[in-house]
Every structure is written in structure tokens, then in C-alpha cells.
Amino acid sequence: MERECEKSVVVAVVTEPRFTQRYRDYLEKQKLLDRQYRVEKLRDGTVALPVLAETLSEHHLQELKNRVAPGSTCKLTQLLDPLPSKKARVCSPAQRLCLEVRRWVEDRGVTWSTELEADLPRSWQRHGDLMLLSEDCFQATQWKRLEPELWETVASALGVQRLAKRGRVLPDGTRTPTVTLLLGDHGWVEHVDNGIRYKFDVTQCMFSFGNITEKLRVASLSCAGEVLVDLYAGIGYFTLPFLVHAGAAFVHACEWNPHAVVALRKNLEINGVADRCQIHFGDNRKLKLSNTADRVNLGLIPSSEEGWPIACQVLRKDVGGILHIHQNVESFSGKNPQPPGSSNMEKKHWPHPQKITTDKQGNRTTGSCMGEMSSASKPEWQRWAESAESQIASLLHQVHGKPWRTRILHVHPVKSYAPHVDHIVLDLECRPCPLVG
């Protein structure tokens, strides 16, 4: 889970106040409660308990809802800038870093200044014994004269053995990170999410911390006997939950970043599912696969639209299937939803998971996919979903030469960005129309 000393975003379990103590007792016993942050009361009167997302699983959520506190509403949310606990306020990681670096710098005869203090890391991600620093730190010229010993001091203050510093993601289609290794001899790290092991090289591959709720949702799906095509597999963010927890019979994983493919192969092996997955290396728009998938995952943002034609191509011709379409949607009032052109955005608080569903009369309504919801889905989400549904129906007709019917099952928020941009997932059911006559 991402740890930041400023503008932190943490996952929290939300329930009613009367169930808070039972939830707290269970989470503490399971070592899931994040003691760095305080339990918070939300605007709608519910209570959010910060948790360690890297060890939280769908099983724990079901335990809370069905055994620990029957009748409770158990939902996930994310908290922006959560309040630190009393214990954490004694000396925060940021304060400890500042104190130790300042002491070390002054011992070497360098005058400490407000410029140097402002140039310390504002955020970081912990990857086991490696800390990945934000790109906007250690830019002052004075630091250069203190390398490489400086990095040993920083690592010691943060309690790690290795250090790296991230830069901007390259606009090369493969989302290659520009990460510099400052201390250590390699960038390979391991994460465990929901019982799934992910290994990757932070200098070559991205890891999507903010997608934990979507990975948990995917893991809870019932995909027994199904064939899935994951058009943007990466290191296995969604391929692995579909295989390990959702029970997919087989996955075709498409990826064109060679470094991500190396990590994906490792992750399939260490999770014991390599025999149920075929990797298709290269541009998925040239994929020869067709008439195969019961389900297609299109996990690319800001838009997966370039993959829509191939998604239609790989669906089974006899019964069709379900598309999981990721998209960033702008939510400006009075504007048609458009995918944003930049991913250089700052995370904000995001709402609880929701859905748009279609009733028997064809009227679309909003509701909950994980218990009752406290806020309505945004109209821009619904307008984009309807537009995507129409385009997919047209593509299906073109690809298969006959009409198909489509139906919006759910629209789920994953996370929100500033300004006014939401990462959402549309679950779209696609079925061939029965022959008449």
C-alpha cells in the first residue's frame, strides 16, 4: 500500500457507528487495522476504519458483514489526508527524515536552509525494503556534493535498505517509468495483495496501488469455467485475481511492454497459475484470437477505446460475454464527458462503489454494488456509459455481421483525480440477437 508523508491516501472499511467496536476488534485481531491513522466519522454518519490494504481480502469483508456484525453495511473507501493516530504524531516519518538528514548535513559543514528542507521528499511509496521517492525532491545543487553517502542516511531514516527516485512516465505507449536507483543493486520488489504475490522491477514497471478496490471486486466475481481475455495485462494486476480468486478457467493475457511480460511470467509461476494462462506479447490490435472469450478486461486509462474492436472480435459468437471497460471521465457540469489527455493528476477522495443498472422496462437507475450507497453516481458517468454502449453495439454488428444486444450492468468508480476526473469501470453485457424465422 502506498505510504505518503503528505497527501496520504489510505483504504478504509466503512460501517455504521453501532458496529464500529466489533469491526475494530476483528481488524486488530487479524492485524489489518492501520494504527498510523485514526478512525474517522464521515459526513453521512458512518465510520471509516483505516486498514492495511495489502493484506485485506474479500474473505475479510465477507467475515465482517456476515459473521462479525450481521446486518452491517461493509464498504470500502479511500481517505485523503487521514488523521494520524496519537502514536504516529509523536514523530512522523517526515519529521524523523528531516531531523536525521539535517543533523547529517550539518555534521559535514553544510549550512541547513529552508531551501534544503523544502526539497526533502513530500511523498514516497514503500516496496518492502525499497523506498520509491517522489520526483520533486532532492533537486537542489547542494545535494549533489553529498552523494552517495546521503542516500544511506535517507534510507536509514526511512527504515529501508534501498532507495529509488521516480520521474515522469514516458509517453511511449508502454507507460515505462523513469526511475533512478539511488541505493541498492537492483529494483526488483514484491507485493502481496489479497493473497496474490506480485514481483516486478520498479525501474521498469508500474504498480497500480490505487486499484486495490477494483482488484478485490474482480476477485469476488464468479468466473468458473470462463475464458477471459485481458487486453492490457501489465504485470498481472487483474489477470491474477481472475485466475487465483475468481476461478477463470483460462486467461489470454496481452501485453507489449517486454519488462512487464518478464514480471508477468514470474507472477504466474509463483502464484501457481501459469498452466492456465497464455501470454500474447505485442500490440493487441494485431491479436489473431477470435470467438474465444466469455469475458474481456480492458484495464487501460485514460481510455481503452483503441481496444474496443478487438474486444468485440474475441467475444464468443454463440453466447457473447461481458466487457469490463476502464475509462477516465471528466465531470465538469454542462460538458459532455471526454477522456482527459493527461495522466499527471493528483488523487482525491473517491466515493463508495456504485453501479448503473437497467431494469426490466429499460430504465437506467443508480444503486449499490456493495450494500447501500450514500451518494448518487454522477450523470457524466451514465452519459459516457450510454455512449460507450452504443459504440460497442455498432462495433459488434460490424465485426460479427449481425445485430447484438448490449446492456449496462454496472458502473464502478475506482478512484478520482483533480481536476474533476474519475476513473470508472463499465461492466457491459454483450449478447448476439437470436435468429428470427
UniProtKB/Swiss-Prot annotation:
Catalytic activity: 4-demethylwyosine(37) in tRNA(Phe) + S-adenosyl-L-methionine = 4-demethyl-7-[(3S)-3-amino-3-carboxypropyl]wyosine(37) in tRNA(Phe) + S-methyl-5'-thioadenosine + H(+)
UniProt cross-references to InterPro entries, sorted A to Z: MeTrfase_TRM5/TYW2, SAM-dependent_MTases_sf, TRM5-TYW2-like_MTfase, TRM5/TYW2-like_N, TYW2_N
Metabolic or biological pathway: tRNA modification; wybutosine-tRNA(Phe) biosynthesis
Gene3D superfamilies with a match to the protein in the record: Met-10+ protein-like domains, Vaccinia Virus protein VP39
Keyword vocabulary terms for this entry: S-adenosyl-L-methionine, Transferase, tRNA processing
Residues holding S-adenosyl-L-methionine: S208, K215, E255, D283, N284
Single GO cellular component term: cytoplasm
CDD domains for the chain: AdoMet_MTases (cd02440)
Keyword tRNA processing in annotation: yes
UniProt GO molecular function: tRNA 4-demethylwyosine alpha-amino-alpha-carboxypropyltransferase activity; tRNA methyltransferase activity
EC numbers on record: 2.5.1.114
Region (Disordered): 331-374
EC class (word): transferase
GO biological process: tRNA methylation; wybutosine biosynthetic process
Protein family membership: Belongs to the class I-like SAM-binding methyltransferase superfamily. TRM5/TYW2 family.
The name this protein goes by in its record: tRNA wybutosine-synthesizing protein 2 homolog
